[in-house]
Swiss-Prot record:
This is Elongation factor 4. Residues 4-181 form the tr-type G domain. It is found in: Cell membrane. It comes from the Bacteria. Its main location: membrane. Its EC number is 3.6.5.n1. InterPro entries: EF-4 (IPR006297), EFG_III/V (IPR035647), EFG_V-like (IPR000640), EFTu-like_2 (IPR004161), G_TR_CS (IPR031157), LepA_C_sf (IPR038363), LepA_CTD (IPR013842), LepA_IV (IPR035654). It is an enzyme of class 3 (hydrolase). It is a peripheral membrane protein. The keyword Nucleotide-binding applies. It catalyses: GTP + H2O = GDP + phosphate + H(+). GTP binds at D16, H17, G18, K19, S20, T21, N128, K129, I130, D131. Keywords: Cell membrane, GTP-binding, Hydrolase, Membrane, Nucleotide-binding, Protein biosynthesis.
Length: 597
């Protein structure tokens, strides 16, 4: 294959700017997919992606255009899936920067552009939705130049929906995206694993970009991170269905199957090389993103524990940012502590477990990872509130802080600044992009933004504000652990870590919701919220009262009193012996509301 005719590129865009639609047009114009087979969001294979209208998983497809070979690596646009974008960019030489002409540059567009620049990619601006009456092409070009700092004179103006000017995008890819550098078939093999998924019959399938050398069916290769050896049984390209080949050469993007059954053997970002003639140095990986949000996953039916473990194994194969470890809860039994990149990521994994793997789970209240510095000078990283040490051993607690960049219309600045202040934000700067939009920068605790910040920001700005963030480290905060007691017993699944100023309000809310969710017992049940043994909120679940006097004659007052006293004594004994059964529905209801809040 003539290496000068290969073009590897990704499409980067903010959510809803038309990225999947442009990918559909490219597939249609190049006859990669027959028009009769083409459906909207063709590369978004998950039902979840189609329903929500978002891209979650990256996808790679080979396209023939004139005498050129394109490899399009599709990427997600939501802030939670930045790690998928960075993997796509590591396998590309160029990026199409798609900007909606009616919305302009948004915060996540900016974040992805910086990723592309870090990877030294050629960026081609594409201005989309020019067919809409509200499109402002000139203003969008100005924003590309002023905010991002790249020239917009070669920007291609298109309507991905109608197909207007989309063939010009193909010519721009040929003209501006560079061919692969140092793509020599005769050098020792170096191929980057940028994604993987599981196939029941062939085991782990790896998506790779070959940077140098050649990989053939029958070759023995090894992973450079752990030296594990495997034998290639099948390889090929996706266009977009899998097409078998005898070999993959330098510059190509394709898939490899080697009957790998253990998902943990394959690390996305690893380099594969041949056993016989190995490369000396691995390829630089890509920037891995660490989970920022942690929650407990417990099977609704305890017999599904092994099934949940197997399902998490399979999902983490294609989602390298997902982390999990085993944990136990007195209230919920055996489960896993799972780490996510944000609320949408958590939501998607929960839904995938339910739909694809048919595993019903209870998810505990999400938490970030805190740094607990003890009085003896040591520290612990705690993501599970129930594992927080006793207050007497704690010197101080630090929580993760982020720098948030918010791009928004000027008329909503007051609303969004109020929201940031309420979330304990520290104002940093405000820049006016033009006469209608601004860039606002705040430092905020991560724990305040992972739950509902995104939704509140969208509703306060009528959907026009966009937001992206970077972790900047840990800062000391006045944090406390709130425990919930039911009839005097601590329920570890309901423990939360919160700021001292909001502890009372959250405790009142949680005890009230528990009172409403837990069915009445035969005895009175106190629901208490405590900080270090001190009760700060209480609700009482009233007891059922059986009418023990209904058979008595109205005038038999002494017998009447005797029966009531006997009932009272019985209830007292029951209360001492009785443990409160919390039904599954109550757990689901409380923890779901915790997430919603």
């Amino acid at each position: 294959m003539d290496k000068s005719k290969i073009r590897n590129f990704s499409i980067i865009a903010h959510i809803d700017h038309g990225k999947s639609t442009l990918a559909d047009r490219i597939l249609e114009l190049t006859n990669t997919v027959a028009a009769r087979d083409l459906e909207e969001q063709f590369l978004d294979q998950m039902d979840l992606e189609r329903e929500r209208g978002i891209t979650i998983k990256l996808n790679a497809v080979q396209i023939k255009y004139k005498d050129y070979t394109f490899h399009l690596i599709d990427t997600p646009g939501h802030v939670d899936f930045t790690y998928e974008v960075s993997r796509s960019l590591a396998a590309s030489e160029g990026a199409l920067l798609l900007v909606d002409a009616t919305q302009g540059i948004e915060a996540q567009t900016l974040a992805n552009v910086y990723l592309a620049l870090e990877n030294n990619l050629e960026i081609i601006p594409i201005i989309n939705k020019i067919d809409l009456p509200s499109a402002n092409v000139e203003k969008t070009k100005e924003e590309i130049e002023n905010v991002i700092g790249i020239p917009a004179d070669n920007a291609v103006c298109v309507s991905a929906k109608t197909g207007l000017n989309c063939e010009k995008v193909l010519d721009a890819i040929v003209d501006y995206v560079p061919a692969p550098k140092d793509a020599d078939d005769n050098k020792p093999l170096k191929a980057l694993i940028f994604d993987s998924y599981f196939d029941e019959y062939r085991g782990v399938i790896m998506l790779i970009r070959v940077f140098q050398g050649k990989l053939k069916v029958g070759d023995d290769f090894k992973f450079m991170s752990n030296n594990a050896n495997y034998h290639v049984i099948e390889l090929g390209v996706r266009n977009p269905k899998e097409t078998k080949k005898e070999y993959l050469e330098a510059g190509e993007v394709g898939y490899v199957a080697a009957t790998i059954r253990d998902a943990k053997e394959v690390h996305v970002g690893d380099t594969i090389t041949l056993v016989e003639n190995p490369a000396l140095e691995p390829l630089p990986g890509y920037k891995r993103k660490k989970p920022v949000l942690f929650t407990g996953f417990y099977p609704i039916d305890t017999r599904d524990y092994a099934e949940l473990k197997k399902s998490l194994d399979k999902i983490s194969l294609s989602d390298s940012s997902l982390t999990w470890e085993q944990e136990t809860s007195k209230a919920l039994g055996f489960g896993f502590r799972v780490g996510f990149l944000g609320m949408l990521h958590m939501d998607v994994i929960q839904e995938r477990l339910s739909r694809e793997y048919k595993v019903g789970i209870i998810a505990t209240s999400p938490s970030v990872e805190y740094k607990v510095v003890k009085t003896n000078g040591t520290f612990e990283m705690i993501s599970n509130p129930s594992l927080m040490p006793d207050r007497t051993y704690i010197d101080h607690i630090e929580e993760p802080y982020i720098e948030a960049t918010i791009i928004l219309p000027n008329e909503y600045i007051g609303n969004i600044m109020d929201l940031c202040q309420n979330k304990r934000g520290i104002y940093k700067s405000l820049d006016y992009i033009d006469d209608s939009r601004s860039r606002l920068i705040y430092e905020m605790p991560l724990g305040e933004i992972v739950f509902d910040f995104f939704d509140k920001m969208k509703s306060l700005s009528k959907g026009y504000a966009s937001f992206e963030y970077d972790l900047i480290g840990y800062k000391t905060s006045d944090l406390v652990k709130v425990d919930i007691l039911l009839n005097g017993d601590k329920i570890d699944a309901f423990s939360i870590i919160t700021h001292k100023d909001s502890a009372y309000e959250k405790s009142r809310d949680l005890t009230k919701r528990l009172k409403d969710a837990i069915p009445r017992q035969n005895f009175e049940v106190p629901v208490q919220a405590t900080i270090g043994g001190k009760i700060i909120a209480r609700e009482t679940i009233k007891a059922f009262r059986k009418d023990v006097t209904h058979k008595l004659h109205a005038s038999d007052i002494s017998r009447y009193k005797k029966l009531l006293e006997k009932q009272k004594a019985g209830k007292k004994k029951m209360k001492m012996l009785g443990s409160v059964e919390v039904p599954q529905e109550a757990f689901l209801d409380i923890l779901k509301t915790n997430v919603d809040k």
